[in-house]
Amino acid sequence: ICMQAGEYIIENMPNALVDVHHPEIKVYIEIRKRAYVYVTSIKGPGGMPVGTSDRSMLLLSGGIDSPVAGYMMAKRGVKIEAVYFHAPPYTSERAKQKVVDLARLVSEYAGNINLHIVNFTDIQLYIYDKCPHDELTIIMRRYMMRIAEKIARERHCLSLITGESVGQVASQTMQSLAATDAVCNMPVFRPVIAFDKNEIIEIAEKIDTFETSIQPFEDCCTIFVAKHPVTKPDIAKMEESEKNLAEKIDEMVKKAIEEREVICVKPCLLYTSPS
């Protein structure tokens, strides 16, 4: 095949020289039902077919990082579902729509995504009322992880995915991540854990989520934020603080899960008719 192709090229391009070691142009031939001959290739996303690595639950916020984390896991063949924590009236319907839009953008790479929208308002207010304010962020994160895990198990997911990057904010120090992981009994994957913000933004721009992520609508992680949040939380102390929630929290978590809204988000693929 190579000899026949080479002979044809030489006959039709008599001025072309053959250099098998350092060619300026490489000719590629793929044999399937027919022969495909080409001289350039465009790099795609790469990775594995979605679904070949089972199912995982993505904690999807309105920020830059979590959509990138979902995209990166989808590249490795993971089927994505997502959970978003909504806190009306402190977070608006536009904030919710922003997350739906982000899920749709990620679905262009991951296929259909079931987006579980959990009303987190009552739980946040209860934690704010009962727990030390410097621990608010971590305790709220711990309950998000608990809820996400319960939904994940219900949906037969084998792991959780978050968009945390170590040291980026107070809730993402090594100690803080250990404190949130302590309440989970399934693996937590953090694909962007060692990336800096510029590296994450570069991927977000490539997958077209960046412009949506920077829309100025607050999510529930940006409200009730302590002025001086703890950055080296003690897990035993967190557990002691959470005892203040014992009277109502289990029932509140159960209600939030049972009353969640589920949206099946599908890709908006645009096809151009051949001219």
Where are the language model's segments positioned?
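Short, conserved beta-strand edge motifs with alternating hydrophobic and charged residues
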Residues: 83-84, 115-119, 158-164
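RNA-binding accessory domains that recognize and position tRNA/RNA substrates
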Residues: 1-57, 67-113, 121, 182, ...
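A short alpha-helix-loop-beta-strand transition element characteristic
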Residues: 208-216
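Conserved G/P- and acidic residue-centered "switch" motifs that form tight phosphate/ATP-binding loops
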Residues: 63
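Conserved small/polar residues in nucleotide/adenosyl-binding loops
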Residues: 271-275
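A glycine-rich phosphate-binding loop feature that marks nucleotide/adenosyl-phosphate handling sites
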Residues: 119-122, 165, 218-225
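The feature marks non-catalytic terminal segments
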Residues: 215-270
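Active-site adenylate/phosphate-handling loop in enzymes that bind or generate adenylated species
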Residues: 4-15, 40-53, 124-125, 129-202, ...
